Amino acid sequence: NGLASVGPLVLILFWLIQSMPTFMGRELHALHNLGVGLFGVAASGLPSPELYPVYHWFLSALSLIPGIDSLSLAAYIPGVQPTAGLEQISGYPVQLLPLASALSALFLILLTWALARATGNDRRTAFASGLVLLTGFACMGLPRISGSDMLFTAILTLAGICLYRGWIKAFAPLWLFAGFALVALSALAGGLLGLVLPLLVSLVFLLWRGTFRRAGARDGALAFGLLLVLLLAWGTFIAFGDGGRELLKTLLENEYLAPVLEAWKLQGQDSWIIVALLAVLWLPWTLLLLFLPWGRIGTFFKGIVVNRKQRPGQGWLWCSAIVTLAVLALLGANMPVLLMPLLPPLAVLTAQGVLNLSARGSRGF
């Protein structure tokens, strides 16, 4: 309880410890060797100049901070300084890239804590959610996973928090405007998933609560209009720039239409892959399933149904986790990094399960 009262500070401390290899520059040569991988980034966080502008904006903003490169301890430790020719990668100082990944990880950790608090959980559960995220196989060594994917997930999580706060109120234009603006940003940070996931989660959540008419209220309609205006404005601005039409064509064909066409072709044939990946990458927390009180599972879900209006936060977490997993399975996702959007709500639900274990279950786990 004492640590939970200062949970964000403790999580920042643990993030700093996990980030030490990053700050020491251990990835600098690996960044160059890995090159640019699928979806515009390699495992190192290198952005592709053709795709997803938000990570570029983030890197550009960081590069404007005076002395930002000096945060990397690689500048002061013999043997890890970049060799000749590696000082610049993708137009950015090479030492900036690991720092950007580490900061993206910090945003994701703190927003997982914020998601737990926003959905009505106490400080203990929120603190435990951050610890679960930090200690799962999927996120162990979190700062060295692709920075662009973590930044996308952080934006998506913040958009979800704003939308949730807006949907549970009768009139909340500020929350919904912020939420849909962040949805537009997440669409430019992660492609199709950034656009589809928050809209589908909102739809399922409103249907679940029996408040679907809330989506057609004036603030909801105006906020959705803001989303369309922002995306159209960005597309128009890019189209009139050098190579803008080719960029838009690449984004639409490869990142928006291609996943839908591939999903139509597969028709769920490879949906088991993402579930199997999740079971492995969420270790050791996957083992929690062995110690849950399955005899009370009916009572548990009955409570969720009965209290769907009194405890909307729980419904939002379950809708987020189920919808995200279903979309990933439908799209035939087969890469671990694509699980990132699922991890924040799953971390909160896992933390709830850990804290509510019986004495026998706790000892067994």
Predicted regions and their residues:
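Membrane-integral, polyisoprenol-dependent glycosyltransferases
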Residues: N1-R363
